């Protein structure tokens, strides 16, 4: 398989992840779902670390890097928990675009904290375009009472997922020096796993984890496998191809999510949302090309 093909297949699996996950949380509690899914993802994370040959370097990681790995893992865990809560309440074609705002937040924070001002005009325009596109995709429904409160709840969780994802990226950049990226991902996933199951236990939901519907369990496992497969293919594409191109292709996962949400849940895009989606794709592509 060529690296370009691997990048496209990686984007495909990344896109279907959210749809598969939503199929697995119709009855299953989102906290329980996150914990179960993380078990599957952890296997792939360490497989990637093994393939890259970086596991042997774990003993040379500095204490400061360990601290930031743990903090980044906690932020990642919080992002995943918020994301799955949002998916359980809101539509895929609304939750995914808001979650992608993490790229905007990370870019803006990097400009302020790290002085990443190369191609500053493009970065500012790109972030503005993505923000506008996201706003267009979040269409307010004319509802009242519980339905209106539900609309606000999914948005709050989706924004939380974006903020924590951006924080995880910044923490990784600040403190994780000299740690191979795949090994760092594996270690952070361990932190996420501990955090996810700790939350399940603290909320008294361990019993629910034992009695998860088999049908939904299959979808949760499939979601984890899709994420892991996407990671492996993306790693292969980056290792054998051009990183800048792979990153651009990966951004197309949002299109896959929207298309499959239409097929699986009949989530239709209005003209306004379609324009918003196009703007998000253009904005993310611009940020990827002109770093």
What is each PLM-predicted segment?
Residues 1-8, 104-163, 270-291:
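Juxtamembrane helix-loop boundary signature in multi-pass membrane transporters
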Residues 39-45, 98-112, 191-195, 230, ...:
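Alpha-helical transmembrane segments of compact multi-pass small-molecule transporters, enriched
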Residues 1-13, 20-69, 80-90, 139-157, ...:
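Membrane-interface interhelical linkers
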Residues 33-34, 95, 184-185:
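Juxtamembrane helix-start motifs in multi-pass secondary transporters
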Residues 9, 36-37, 71, 98-101, ...:
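Hydrophobic core positions of alpha-helical segments in small-molecule transporters
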Residues 65-73, 119-131, 181-191:
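Alpha-helical transmembrane segments
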Residues 13, 20, 40, 75-76, ...:
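Hydrophobic residues within membrane-embedded alpha-helical segments of Major Facilitator Superfamily
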Residues 22, 84, 110-111, 173, ...:
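Small-residue-mediated transmembrane helix hinge/kink sites in multi-pass secondary transporters
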């Amino acid at each position: 398989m060529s690296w370009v093909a691997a990048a496209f297949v990686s984007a495909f699996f990344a896109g279907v992840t959210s749809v598969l996950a939503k199929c697995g949380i119709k009855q299953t509690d989102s906290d329980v779902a996150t914990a179960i899914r993380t078990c599957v993802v952890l296997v792939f994370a360490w497989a990637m670390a093994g393939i890259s040959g970086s596991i042997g370097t774990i003993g040379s990681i500095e204490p400061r890097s360990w601290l930031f790995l743990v903090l980044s893992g906690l932020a990642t865990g919080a992002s995943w928990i918020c994301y799955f809560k949002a998916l359980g309440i809101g539509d895929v074609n609304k939750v995914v675009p808001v979650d992608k705002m993490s790229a905007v937040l990370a870019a803006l924070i990097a400009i302020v904290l790290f002085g990443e001002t190369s191609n500053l005009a493009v970065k500012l325009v790109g972030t503005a375009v993505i923000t506008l596109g996201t706003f267009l995709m979040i269409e307010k429904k004319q509802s009242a009472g519980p339905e209106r409160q539900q609309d606000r709840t999914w948005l709050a969780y989706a924004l939380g997922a974006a903020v924590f994802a951006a924080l995880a990226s910044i923490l990784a950049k600040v403190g994780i020096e000299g740690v191979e990226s795949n090994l760092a991902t594996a270690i952070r996933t361990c932190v996420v796993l501990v955090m996810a199951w700790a939350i399940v236990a603290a909320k008294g939901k361990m019993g629910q984890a034992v009695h998860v519907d088999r049908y939904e369990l299959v979808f949760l496992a499939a979601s984890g496998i899709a994420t892991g497969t996407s990671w492996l293919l993306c790693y292969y594409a980056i290792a054998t191809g051009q990183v800048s191109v792979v990153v651009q292709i990966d951004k197309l996962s949002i299109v896959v999510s929207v298309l499959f949400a239409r097929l699986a849940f009949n989530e239709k895009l209005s003209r306004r949302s379609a324009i918003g989606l196009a703007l998000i794709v253009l904005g993310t592509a611009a940020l990827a090309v002109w770093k």
